[in-house]
Amino acid sequence: MTEPATPPAPVSAVRIDGPWTHRDVAANGARFHVAEAGDGPLVLLLHGFPQFWWSWRHQLTALADAGFRAVAMDLRGVGGSDRTPRGYDPANLALDITGVVRSLGEPDAAIVGHDLGGYLAWTAAVMRPKLVRRLAVASMPHPRRWRSAMLSDVKQTAAGSYIWGFQRPWIPERRLVADDAALTGRLIREWSGPRLPDDEAVEVYRRAMCVPSTAHCSIEPYRWMVRSLARPDGIQFNRRMKMPVRVPTLHLHGSLDPVMRTRSAAGSGEYVEAPYRWRLFDGLGHFPHEEDPVAFSTELINWLKDPEPDR
């Protein structure tokens, strides 16, 4: 006898109350949920896997208090955003992001991305440079660096083994939501350093993963990233990413990140023809913005306010 399926969570589960406002914006043929706080220059925050906009809750308030308009968006297919049947390649997801910038009525934004959100932030800075004022990336190397590390570094290939597991049809989705998304919680705990997110936060992420179609849409970008390696569209994307990033860039990484090795992330500055700042957080894992939100927010805000960020 099979075990009963995990009951789906309502979309309202991701519209969590706090010192921010929720709204929906249209961009690139879809509807995107955002949480917004503060007034000032726009800072757009992009979450990673297996999370949603709420991972930036600490930075939303810190940035608002520092005089910025902080907006955390749910990526396509996640949280409160539309779950479309296609459109999960990084080039299109980057157009989602820059489209949201325009829909928010701003000429440009400082884009801050973590994990998959970081991959897309790098991409947006190359594809739509006029809409990206500054770039900050956490826990993710430049896409070309990611590609070379995954293909040539045995230790990085092993560290990112979950991505290879995502290539099977349907099984990964079922595993992510089984037993009230227990695997989602386990991944967050295993990928964190000693200051892992508390049990309450992990429960929020587990519940969000149980919103219908979230698991499938969350892993579709990773399927593209692997399956396109030898396809014309993937080769074309990799060539396009040779174009240098020409905006000031802050690269943040946890020294204990078990998913993206420090060696893999470091060196991404070779793709930046602008001031590039690398900061390694000692003792933090894959989620530095949640593991030590004060240190992360301080580093980010100081850099955003620096009129001439150093290399």
Predicted regions and their residues:
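A short loop-to-beta-strand scaffold at the N-terminal edge of the catalytic core in hydrolase folds
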Residues: 27-36
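A short, glycine- and basic residue-enriched loop/turn
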Residues: 52-53, 119, 284
